[in-house]
Amino acid sequence: MFNTTFANRTLPDLVEIQRASFCWFLNEGLAEEIQSFSPIVNYTGNLELHLFGDQYTLRYPKHNINECKRRDTTYSVQIYVPAQLINRETGVIKEQEVFIGDLPLMTDRGTFIINGAERVIVNQIVRSPGIYYKSELDKQGRRTYSSSLISNRGAWVKFETDRNDLVWVRIDKTRKIPAHVFLKAMGLSDTDIYNGLRHPEYLKKTFRFEGNYTTETALIQMYNKLRPGEPATVTGGQQLLYSRFFDPKRYDLGKVGRYKLNKKLNLSVPENVRVLTPQDTLAAIDYLINLKFEIGETDDIDHLGNRRVRSVGELLQNQVRIGLNRLERIIRERMTICDITSLTPNTLVNPKPIIASIREFFGSSQLSQFMDQTNPLAELTHKRRISALGPGGLNRDRAGFGVRDIHPSHYGRICPIETPEGPNAGLIGVLATHARINTYGFIEAPFFKVQDGQVYNHSQPIYLTADQEDKYRIAPGDITLDETNRIATKIVPIKYRQEFTTTKPNQVDFIAVSPIQVISIATSLIPFLEHDDANRALMGSNMQRQAVPLLYPESPLVGTGLEAQAARDSGMVVVSIEDGQVTFVSGDKICVTNKKGDEIAYYLQKYQRSNQDTCINQRPTVWLGEDVIEGQVIADGAATEGGELALGQNILVAYLPWEGYNYEDAFLINERLVYNDVYTSVHIEKYEIEARQTKLGSEEITRELPNVGEAALRKLDENGIIVIGSWVEAGDILIGKVTPKGESDQPPEGKLLRAIFGEKARDVRDTSLRVPNGGRGRILDVRIFTREKGDELPTGANIVIRVYIAQSRKIQVGDKMAGRHGNKGIISRILPRQDMPYLPDGTPVDLVLNPLGVPSRMNVGQIFECLLGLAAENLNKRFKITPFDEMHGAEASRVLVNEKLNEAKIKTGENWLFDLRHPGKITLYDGRTGEAFDNPVTIGVSYMLKLVHLVDDKIHARSTGPYSLVTQQPLGGRAQHGGQRLGEMEVWALEAFGASYTLQELLTVKSDDMQGRNETLNAIVKGKPIPRPGTPESFKVLMRELQSLGLDIGAYKIENLPDGQTRGIEVDLMMNYQQSRLFKPLYESMQTKNNENLFL
């Protein structure tokens, strides 16, 4: 028997971290913040404004979630707070309910709708407020100790010892103050100080060295150190000390800071005392001195006991505080300026500061991110992400290896596998499967109690923080237990005080609840994970999030058992909220009648566009008359099948080299995958156009376009708008629009006509919305927004039209595919099915992989998966393999795979399925010749994904296009229709080859020699020889930049004189601009047959 009791239960709700935090904000955080600002008193003290934050109300949102997405508005509620204005002179009390701002509301999926787009607030991991001790060796090898007292808000205090054994205090990195001066200034007497220290003799050295002080002289000395140059007084010192450490508005340890301080220094200060107390300071100095005597221990700042998570609620609370601070200043100013008798709470309170603060946070904060909606797993992982970046966090450029590294305290809390590759590695992590966050923001992991080797795994698990866990001996979740739930092995691997070691079963205190509690959701979806190298498992986890939802989803034959919960918690599937019977089913609606006879309607999303342009489409999975139970999946979403996550397809793969087409991780695929739409996905693009009010008149949406033939308008309706259901190709008109044009926009012939006849050619130009290059598909929807309908439009816009185009993309050469084990590659060739290698029963292989991609990458899990998949296909079964199966015996994976292949061989009677001489390998035949390959080949059924990196979105070419204004070189990138950069290394290659004329041409007329460009074009049009290149524009820019630095620098032409002497003549590089008319191509030569102008 094994420790599977809890592992097989469902995991905790995976999006709870977001929802719980936002609920806390609504229930406590918001009220607490508003209360802390009340009352606001004016400078004379005769007016008081009280805000009753605990009685605030929220008004219902104006539109529902779907309507907000359609209209591009924010799904938010209005906050109203009861307020009371008291005039102390007259005793008049005015009461009103005041509006203080809009608050975006979280959807039940843990997201926010901001300006029509779904966004997620990422959890931030920061250093917890509290006190931290560290030791350092100075240059002479002597050990000095220091500690930092970090507050939630306000000054940081640093206590330090030096090589002379003196104790100092630093406030916010200012000058050092002797420790006893600081203690005396805080009001402690000599007796208090000596009684509070275990080693008072150590501090006496500081007394002797710096002299003794009374409270008054200590305050003056402290004021002099902190504010040098200002006249010091005792009152000034007291005010300075109060404002720095005792004013709750300026200094706040926070609930967490007080808890950590009490715990570290063994104090019993009440939790509601959030400011610094003299006991705190004395205890901090006592602990510092004790470290010198080897009592106590220093802290590890990377330990999860010293780092806490700030979720949505707390981040929002901080933002509301910023808004309230601004509001408080405005209220005080209005109390002073306005007539007291006419003042009311509503005239005092301006909601703009809070609205601006919240909008800034949701719109532009580093932690408010556009939700990754590629597939359900991407969505789920994004909500569970933990970032060390952002305001108050780290900077990726300055973060060292220590912060990024895996720490022993991450065990069961933060996944050691799933993190980005590149500059953010280690700074962005994901919560482990069973982890949760406690009220203080520390991450907790669950464990079962163990006593004398007996595991109590039928009771509720105990959640421990990283600090608590250090005190116990903890065994992993994959050790073997006997029938009575006792640990069956003599020696148990354990984690104790940051070390991994072994011990006897009776020494174990706790055991992990499941082998997968160490890793994240995405990583736990990889079968045979324990056989993969961590680097490849990381790629596998990240690439599952990039899988495109396919037209016909198929769940994996070999899974891990977590697919159903991942799909359910992502919110992509529709779940029945009550028991009942299905009374109506259609493509977009399901009705369930519950036991009371009430009908509950569930509306399905049909062909909605996700943030990443993939298609969200829900399909019913229940029949009319079917009985459903609470929590049952009644409709599948994108990339789910039967309520389980289905990111890819099960296809037949073979590991063999094939004519070099799978060199360097390239894939060779069967045309069946194209023709049978196995890897076809639907993508929805959004195009938008505005008709604006211009200085010359308003733009018009119309079918009457200048110089456009009827053929180009055939798909538009009478208003010039594309008809839904039309098929469009690149360059087709979607919305006809004309813009009035001014005199300067007229071409020369138009000016001539007006000069001769005074006739006005139609003075509008065609600015229609067209399908961009590479775009094609079916018109899915057209949405028209006007002010008359009550839609909110951008300033200056009269009408906004959005067109949605759906396109189905089959798999093609250049697309990226990957397995779940980090085995990724690009499709290099699509072979006819008759040419593919085939099995002894004639089945052609779907995908040919390179066997050299396995040994060096050490991701052997893919081999186990493909062989077990082959057995599953032949046995008509599906397997759920929980990672880390060695607890079932040595080489458990190999035994299982061989066993199942043998079983498949017996059941199907196909002897080739399992051969003892080379288990897992099969004689394969070449489809072109029909001959067997020389050696047996590993074949099997693997779960392969098509990733979002599609060649259609990346392929790009340019003939003519835009140039940069400054350097006059072609722009870069597909979005700008840019050119290919000929960089430094390419120049070296041409230099090495000696291709001087080719190089000169590339660096001048093909790039930024403006005069040469035009002359070359002219020469090509007229069929004349190409002229010599001129000076590149970038050279002129360089000259001008050097001249702007005050350097007298110029370009000179060397001329030979008749007497054999030479002289330099300065060349005017700007001459081209003054005589620019000469270099323009002649107008006649630039005419094409259709009388359209050509421009480079």
Curated annotation (Swiss-Prot):
GO terms for molecular function: DNA binding; DNA-directed RNA polymerase activity; ribonucleoside binding. One of its GO terms (cellular component) is DNA-directed RNA polymerase complex. GO terms for biological process: DNA-templated transcription. Its EC number is 2.7.7.6. Belongs to the RNA polymerase beta chain family. Keywords: Chloroplast, DNA-directed RNA polymerase, Nucleotidyltransferase, Plastid, Transcription, Transferase. This is DNA-directed RNA polymerase subunit beta. It holds the Pfam family RNA_pol_Rpb2_1. CDD domains: RNA_pol_B_RPB2. Coiled coil: none annotated. HAMAP family: RNApol_bact_RpoB. SUPFAM superfamilies: beta and beta-prime subunits of DNA dependent RNA-polymerase. DNA-dependent RNA polymerase catalyzes the transcription of DNA into RNA using the four ribonucleoside triphosphates as substrates. In plastids the minimal PEP RNA polymerase catalytic core is composed of four subunits: alpha, beta, beta', and beta''. When a (nuclear-encoded) sigma factor is associated with the core the holoenzyme is formed, which can initiate transcription. It comes from the Eukaryota. It catalyses: RNA(n) + a ribonucleoside 5'-triphosphate = RNA(n+1) + diphosphate. NCBIfam families: PRK00405.1 (NF001616), rpoB (TIGR02013). It is found in: Plastid, Chloroplast. Transmembrane segments: none annotated.
